[in-house]
């Protein structure tokens, strides 16, 4: 065994203070295997040591929540004996180093988190952030990431139904790749990770262990340096065909009564899976490392425990079920090996070559791992540090039609068809909607459908992390409501920079506070998630810290998919209404919000102003009203108003439906305020029968919840243009960015 020097400790990402804690926990010096295990289990990626204190404050419970944070994925009851199981995970650092494999294995990992719990995956989604398109590496990164996501998801046979892709200079040196999977299971056939039953066999299944991905979790818990190419060996290599076999083999075994517990080997591989299973079961674990299936000669216990080779699972089986399970995995041409047993010691003991090479108490590895309450500053101090001030000289729009064309052609609003065409969105034959406010997939064999949305506005989060956190949750809620779904629960991926900087820690704490307030008001609990910190880069040409990016994945249920709503204009002559805060019906121009708007940035080159506030009461009430209008058949199209404001929402509806609209500006607002302000809590709806709508609204006026929601007639569906611009020109502008960028 190698000598443990201060340099070796530092190379494992451990501080001298943390090493002292290890010495105290063991009562001796660790060997290299033990040091490696501590290093990955105490990494930010596995231990959440900088965020755990604050994550505990999030709302995680509701009558329909079956399992919240702490397991492989969140589980919610969707009725009729079915559960939705879902989670979002990051694969940021690997995707910058090796974009295809980084993104592909991100998809593979999140798929395993979901089917580990007994669900058949039914939909994938993603949230991607890239740097400036003109950055010399960015086209390569975009092409690789998109190909990796598509290549893996398509081969496994799970449709990618929604996602978001944004560009900003803050991601020049540190892109974000967040992947989400949703699965469906029977509520009485959900599998958990707690290893119980002393003497029960521990079984390794899937692919063989190689040297790829060693210290991937540690690498994902530090800032980037300039030598990213040297870190390629820490990026895992995925095989989607093996993953497909693994899904089918696991689901087949799950149909029997053989499994006691199951866990995928994700970050930190065999180490984290075994530690988590024993910790959750309040037991111990003994592994015979000689029995671990390896694909390379001479692998050491250190390498086996820290490898992040893909497509592997760890199980605890009932005694006597090994032979039957082995036959199933043999049929699917996958490795199967009994490598250990559950003990009552609450210790991790590893044996190799007839010797004990690791003997660690589980407490210090998991529940007793370091926990940091890192320094923060006040929100007002933060805004002063970030130089956030209100706009005092907001410009107007001299030609809203011309400005709309610029916006629709800009990287952050341009058509994502180039991306979507690389994803198979229809495999499985249950996809009902893509490219709308939310992706929608049928719950196979039922009338129900799941709606899925991914949302976050990082520029809002930078200017005001609290309001940005609220808005991210609220927009996910709006997007689900807009397709006719009842929002049920949230998963998240919290992407932030170095938490040891008080300003960055403030971003994280305030964003979580905003998210928590929004989830409580909207009855929209958080059931799973992931934290990715140290998203900073010293890479040549890169920026420093990313924008705070708490990516939100929302899931809702549509009880009858025939009532699903889409955004496209349908019928000429339908009346168009703007629905939202009542001050839009009784104008108050002082409340129109151009700060941090895309219009101000794209048209005027000004990334300025404050984040638009999110009124959570308005969000809740407007969502309920939209849901009722859809259920009652009173609207033909619904779309939420977000990036780019009202004009962009109308343009997206026109392009989706293939017909224009005649719309009017409220003269009490400037053209910029009316068409491009990004006030929150708003929807655009089209109504075929205004009398029926008015009758429904008149009945609703007695309901206090409708009192703060205004309806304003703004135009009529029809024609072949919008704001003086032809649909043909709008479509060309919208399609131009990716086509021209990728052809160069």
Curated annotation (Swiss-Prot):
GO biological process, alphabetically ordered: 'de novo' IMP biosynthetic process
Reaction catalyzed: N(2)-formyl-N(1)-(5-phospho-beta-D-ribosyl)glycinamide + L-glutamine + ATP + H2O = 2-formamido-N(1)-(5-O-phospho-beta-D-ribosyl)acetamidine + L-glutamate + ADP + phosphate + H(+)
Predominant location: cytoplasm
Entries under InterPro entries matching the protein: PRibForGlyAmidine_synth_PurL, PurL_linker, PurM-like_C_dom, PurM-like_C_sf, PurM-like_N, PurM-like_N_sf
Compartments reported by the entry: Cytoplasm
Keywords recorded for this protein, A-Z: ATP-binding, Cytoplasm, Ligase, Magnesium, Metal-binding, Nucleotide-binding, Purine biosynthesis
Oligomeric and partner information: Monomer. Part of the FGAM synthase complex composed of 1 PurL, 1 PurQ and 2 PurS subunits.
Taxonomy, superkingdom: Bacteria
Binding annotation for Mg(2+) 2: 113, 264
Positions bound to Mg(2+) 1: 89, 530
Protein name: Phosphoribosylformylglycinamidine synthase subunit PurL
A Pfam family: FGAR-AT_linker
Enzyme class (EC, first level): ligase
Family: Belongs to the FGAMS family.
Gene that this polypeptide is encoded by: purL
Function noted in UniProt: Part of the phosphoribosylformylglycinamidine synthase complex involved in the purines biosynthetic pathway. Catalyzes the ATP-dependent conversion of formylglycinamide ribonucleotide (FGAR) and glutamine to yield formylglycinamidine ribonucleotide (FGAM) and glutamate. The FGAM synthase complex is composed of three subunits. PurQ produces an ammonia molecule by converting glutamine to glutamate. PurL transfers the ammonia molecule to FGAR to form FGAM in an ATP-dependent manner.
Active site: residue positions: 45, 91
Functional pathway: Purine metabolism; IMP biosynthesis via de novo pathway; 5-amino-1-(5-phospho-D-ribosyl)imidazole from N(2)-formyl-N(1)-(5-phospho-D-ribosyl)glycinamide: step 1/2
Residue positions binding ATP: 48, 87, 492, 529
Coiled coil (residue ranges): none
